[in-house]
Amino acid sequence: DDCYPWEILPKIKDFILKLGPTLPKDKFDEIEKNVWVAKSAVVAKTASITGPCIIDEDTEVRHCAFIRGNALVGKHCVVGNSTELKNVILFNNVQVPHYNYVGDSILGYKSHMGAGSITSNVKSDKKLVVVKSENEAIETGLKKFGAMLGDNVEVGCGSVLNPGTVIGPNSNIYPLSSVRGIVPAGSIYKHAGEVVIKQVEE
């Protein structure tokens, strides 16, 4: 059977609850029930964190960040001012630094969301999310599913990633874009209907 990355989303909570107690106590503090924060992480006093949550080493959680639970945040990440996370995995070196909402999503290594860009995780008609490409529609069985970002994805400021968006590695999304469906790896998403493959520099 095919296996898709969004199948992980309903399992994030249980994974964190299983992993958290095994983290080395010389490197992590359980600052409150089911919230494990690396000693080398920097968390602003004004940040709000609800468990279960793991914040890994050398990550920065800035002023008024809001982590609503089921968040696995990797090493060297930035969770910025007024950014909200819920049921997410952020791989190492991810940056969501300014006014971002990331819900029911997975962000790959070194991906970056520009200021004000968000993942929209529920369809307006409240139906189950379907991932659509040019050739097929994949039923996810999920009511809440934001986006899957590959490694080194750059999302421009003010963009909306609609429910069920999948962006391949090394792709760029123009600012103020409304993105849906599958964006191939190595692409530049300019607007709906205009997605170009990056030119390889020799």
Predicted regions and their residues:
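Short, conserved secondary-structure segments in the cores of folded domains
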Residues: 27, 31-33, 51, 63, ...
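A generic structural signal for ordered secondary structure
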Residues: 54, 84, 190-192
